[in-house]
A protein has these predicted regions:
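Membrane-interface helix/loop boundary segments of multi-pass membrane proteins
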Residues: 127-153, 196-203
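Active-site His/Glu-centered metal-binding helix of metallohydrolases
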Residues: 17, 126-130, 134-135, 139, ...
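Hydrophobic core positions of alpha-helical segments in small-molecule transporters
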Residues: 7-10, 86-87, 148-152, 206-207
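Residue-level hotspots within the lipid-embedded alpha helices of multi-pass solute transporters
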Residues: 120-125, 153, 157, 180-185
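Juxtamembrane helix-entry segments on the extracytoplasmic side of multipass membrane proteins
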Residues: 105-117, 168-182
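Small-polar-interrupted transmembrane alpha-helices in polytopic inner-membrane proteins
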Residues: 15, 91-95, 148-161
Length: 259
């Protein structure tokens, strides 16, 4: 079995087993998953399924040197501060542009964004060890970057599906699958941009956590238009910074400055 097949099997086994049990229990009892500590622990286990699978498969399949580099990329901060500024800007535009266009609600103080980041590193950010750190990396060895990003997006959408059946999740309460799917693809392109340009899993983790935190403060009205706006922006950023063909001289200078 190839590394990608092992990773996919492990990820979906961990997550679907954990979230599947929660979905069945919450539906039978008609209670939100957050009402039980045991259910919440199962929820977190499902969330970090991609990280567990990525680390496990990498340890068993890669050389000691490659595995060590993989782990280091997960926890070692990037020293170039320009990349952090880049991430802050693209995440804020990605999150707030739909909010201001289609409307929404600010549910807590802006200061909460920074305070929530550690929580969203655990609930969201660590996924990047598996999705971008392992799966995208392995796919890019075999197929073009754009195709790899699209494939990860599709798998990522399917991975989230149990959340739509768990009472108390944001997906169950507020989202529909088509709009959510567009949002996942949009976010995937943004994260791919960060990964392809930096090769840093740590920065992908921080990007995911920061974006989740912003979206938890500024909650946009769920609409097809909002999803399309986010998708257009993420594709724009991807094409500017990742697709090296037909790039303007100005954008190449911007790219050089960031690096």
């Amino acid at each position: 079995m190839s590394k990608l097949k092992k990773y996919s099997f492990s990820t979906f086994s961990i997550t679907f087993l954990s979230w599947g049990m929660i979905a069945v229990y919450t539906q039978i009892k008609n209670i939100p998953f957050g009402s039980s500590i045991a259910l919440y622990i199962l929820y977190i286990l499902g969330v970090i399924g991609p990280a567990i699978a990525g680390i496990t498969v990498s340890k068993r399949s890669d050389s000691k040197e490659d595995f060590s580099m993989f782990l280091k990329s997960c926890y070692q901060p990037t020293k170039n501060l320009n990349w952090y500024l880049f991430i802050i800007v693209i995440v804020l535009v990605f999150s707030l542009l739909p909010y201001f266009v289609v409307g929404g609600e600010q549910i807590v103080l802006v200061q909460i964004i920074l305070l929530q980041i550690p929580i969203f590193i655990l609930i969201g950010g660590l996924e990047e060890i598996g999705w971008r750190g392992f799966m995208l990396r392995e796919l890019t060895k075999r197929i073009p970057a754009l195709t790899s990003t699209l494939l990860v997006s599709i798998v990522w959408i399917f991975w989230h599906l149990p959340l739509f059946f768990i009472i108390g999740t944001y997906q169950y309460e507020y989202l529909n699958i088509p709009v959510f799917s567009i949002s996942v693809i949009s976010f995937s392109f943004l994260l791919s941009t960060v990964y392809y340009k930096t090769k840093s899993i740590f920065l992908c983790i921080m990007t995911h956590a920061f974006c989740n935190s912003v979206l938890n403060v500024f909650v946009s009205n769920q609409s097809l238009l909002g999803g399309i706006i986010a998708l257009v922006f993420s594709l724009f950023i991807y094409l500017l910074f990742v697709n090296n063909s037909n790039r303007s001289l100005i954008m190449k200078k911007v790219d050089t400055y960031i690096e």
